[in-house]
């Protein structure tokens, strides 16, 4: 973060990687080259790592060696969750943080003129993710050894890091401050007093003792004990039991919201909001749009009244330009502004992620412009937005794009491509062959039977939903245990299907897009690509290389493309696979390595998910029949399950259990 703050930032913390592995294959040269280039000041480079070569481990080694705060961006929440789990295992002693959109459900504010329908913003904020977002921003302001794993939501407006840091309340034993002054300070930074329901972002008061629950935690809180108008001592406590966990020499409490502004700035912001409203009202009236003029006046005056009274209003982010003191068109503050100037960015699956970063701005502006044109929002709401790609680029000090198939954009940014082709397991890229489409069903059935007899699994990728369904029906008739995975299947269900495939509940998985995250199955020895010669997103060079990679985790990996001609994309994908395979075979021969299928533990699919969903449903039925004591027991049990789900990053289930807890509490 740029600018001075009152926080003692620990600059000398070192990253410490914990792993039972040593770099092997071509990981050592990849790590060495990336590190040397970063230390030599190179701005951008690409880590072009084949599937299964241990790219995350290489990234971790680089982070440890360059020792800079690092932002890792993934293209969706699920992938970000997987990376967060891996980095947390590699760096147990450092701050590994998770920053994704905190909406479980999010319907953005919108207006549809054709049907005169205004859709109000409707969202449910996931409390666990909100905690993790606060944990990320506070860690960045307090220490140097921080890795933040984020989705593309990190380029959305977040509020000024300077206001956030300057609003922080700093407390030490011996400090002269009255209890009432502390209570006022806490309310100013959006903490709520609640002496009964003690949770994140709240505080309670008992005589000369104030207990405070920071927004970035969900288990331990802090107890501040006063002697007169002086802090006597500060202790960390267990929030549920109140048990003392030890004394604290310094406590920094960051605001309970990222959108902070001081009183002086608030007055200035309100003045500017009202001026902008008058201009907009006059413009609407001049155009004869009296409904729009009345609408924008009514809405703005209500919001301003809330800001004056509470310091906050729903949709406060739409006034962020005024709150931050930005000029029209200036980019908003984002998570990137919370980092120090010299930080490292790593873009995972960059061929997907960079496309997302490019597309965010236009989609956001189109929706908001409609709200402005019809008097639901002031024009300044257009400046509460994601960064444009060039604005994102201006934040880049040093960046590493990570992908098996880097996109054109990344290749234009740098000529430095560091390859990682050798797998630690000695596994080779699979053999690829092309077969004609005539008689492909019978041919495929024969191949499937040959694989399933050996206890191996098969992926089949089609181009259309109809073909996938027809093929599934045909294979079922032929006695094959098969499932079709379509795009409507939710993330959790997808994980369950993959687990069942690995366990042998069924043998063949058919899908249109088998490049989705988490679909890495070592038991798959055959990937069949139907209509391989139909050019398009999933049949271009990158799509084919990624699909071929799905067979690269098995020592008998084989790929069959069914096609009547060999397209340029097919040829390039086959040439690249053959090139890698040759390098891998030469390495194995030189080092006497025999390829070994990856031994990947089949984790008990978020073990609490199925049983708990059943239990939760059962509890729901019995709520009304419970007495008070039974309900208290049920609440404790559910809260434990909720924390377990959250720790496993199963936020959907955690939110579901949280709703059950709230329902139970409301019965008392």
From Swiss-Prot:
Q: Can you tell me which family this protein belongs to?
A: Belongs to the UvrB family.
Q: Outline what the protein does.
A: The UvrABC repair system catalyzes the recognition and processing of DNA lesions. A damage recognition complex composed of 2 UvrA and 2 UvrB subunits scans DNA for abnormalities. Upon binding of the UvrA(2)B(2) complex to a putative damaged site, the DNA wraps around one UvrB monomer. DNA wrap is dependent on ATP binding by UvrB and probably causes local melting of the DNA helix, facilitating insertion of UvrB beta-hairpin between the DNA strands. Then UvrB probes one DNA strand for the presence of a lesion.
Any GO MF annotation of the entry: excinuclease ABC activity
One cellular component term (GO) for this entry is: cytoplasm
Q: Which residues are in the Helicase C-terminal domain?
A: 440-606
Taxonomically, the superkingdom here is Bacteria
Keywords for the protein's UniProt record, in alphabetical order: ATP-binding, Cytoplasm, DNA damage, DNA excision, DNA repair, Excision nuclease, Helicase, Hydrolase, Nucleotide-binding, SOS response
| Entry protein name | UvrABC system protein B
């Amino acid at each position: 973060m740029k600018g001075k703050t009152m926080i003692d930032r620990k600059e000398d913390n070192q990253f410490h990687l914990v792993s039972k592995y040593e770099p092997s294959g071509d990981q050592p040269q990849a790590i060495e080259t990336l590190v040397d280039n970063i230390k030599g000041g190179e701005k951008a480079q690409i880590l072009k790592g084949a599937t299964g070569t241990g790219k995350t481990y290489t990234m971790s080694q680089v982070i440890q060696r360059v020792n800079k705060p690092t932002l890792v961006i993934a293209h969706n929440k699920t992938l970000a969750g997987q990376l967060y789990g891996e980095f947390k295992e590699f760096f147990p002693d450092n701050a590994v943080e998770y920053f994704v959109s905190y909406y479980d459900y999010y319907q953005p504010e919108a207006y549809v003129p054709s049907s005169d329908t205004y859709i109000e913003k409707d969202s449910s904020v996931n409390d666990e993710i909100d905690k993790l977002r606060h944990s990320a921003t506070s860690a960045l302001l307090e220490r140097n050894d921080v890795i933040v794993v984020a989705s593309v939501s990190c380029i959305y407006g977040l509020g000024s890091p300077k206001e956030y840091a300057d609003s922080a309340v700093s407390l030490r034993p011996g400090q002269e401050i009255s209890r009432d002054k502390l209570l006022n300070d806490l309310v100013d930074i959006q903490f709520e007093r609640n002496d009964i329901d003690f949770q994140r972002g709240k505080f309670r008061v008992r005589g000369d003792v104030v207990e405070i629950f920071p927004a970035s935690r969900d288990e331990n809180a802090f107890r501040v004990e006063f002697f007169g108008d002086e802090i006597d001592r500060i202790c960390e406590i267990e929030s549920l039991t109140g048990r003392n966990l030890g004394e604290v020499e310094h406590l920094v409490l960051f605001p309970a919201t990222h959108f902070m502004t001081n009183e002086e700035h608030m007055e200035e912001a309100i003045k500017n909001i009202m001026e902008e409203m008058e201009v907009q009202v006059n413009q609407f009236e001049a155009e004869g749009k009296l409904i729009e003029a009345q609408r924008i006046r009514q809405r703005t005056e209500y919001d301003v009244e809330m800001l004056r009274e509470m310091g906050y209003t729903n949709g406060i982010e739409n006034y962020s330009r005024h709150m931050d003191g930005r000029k029209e068109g200036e980019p908003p503050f984002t998570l990137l502004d919370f980092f120090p100037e010299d930080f490292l960015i790593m873009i995972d699956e960059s061929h997907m992620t960079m496309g997302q970063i490019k597309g965010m701005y236009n989609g956001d502006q189109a929706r908001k412009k409609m709200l402005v044109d019809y008097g639901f929002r002031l024009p300044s709401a257009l400046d509460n937005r994601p960064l444009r790609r060039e604005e994102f680029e201006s934040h880049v000090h040093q960046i590493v794009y990570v992908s098996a198939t880097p996109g054109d954009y990344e290749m234009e940014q740098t000529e430095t491509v560091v390859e990682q082709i050798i797998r630690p397991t000695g596994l080779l890229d699979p053999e690829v062959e092309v077969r004609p489409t005539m008689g492909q069903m019978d041919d495929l059935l024969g191949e499937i039977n040959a694989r399933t007899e050996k206890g191996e699994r098969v992926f089949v990728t089609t181009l259309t939903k109809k073909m996938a369904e027809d093929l599934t029906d045909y294979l079922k008739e032929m006695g094959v245990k098969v499932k079709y995975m379509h795009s409507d299947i939710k993330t959790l269900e997808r994980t369950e299907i993959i687990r069942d495939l690995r366990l042998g509940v069924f043998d063949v998985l058919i899908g249109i897009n088998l490049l989705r995250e988490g679909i890495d199955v070592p038991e798959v020895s055959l990937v069949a690509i139907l209509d391989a010669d139909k050019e398009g997103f999933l049949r271009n060079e990158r799509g084919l290389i990624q699909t071929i990679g799905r067979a690269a985790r098995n020592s008998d990996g084989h790929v069959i493309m069914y096609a009547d001609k060999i397209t340029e994309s097919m040829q390039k994908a086959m040439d690249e696979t053959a090139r890698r395979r040759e390098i891998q075979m030469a390495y194995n021969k030189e080092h006497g390595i025999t390829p070994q299928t990856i031994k990947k533990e089949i984790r008990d699919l978020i073990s609490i998910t199925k049983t708990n969903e059943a239990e939760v449903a059962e509890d729901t039925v019995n709520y009304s029949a419970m007495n008070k004591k039974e309900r208290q027991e049920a609440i404790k049990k559910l809260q434990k399950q909720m924390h377990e789900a959250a720790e496993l990053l199963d936020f959907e289930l955690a939110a579901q259990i949280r709703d059950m807890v709230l329902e139970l509490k409301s019965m008392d």
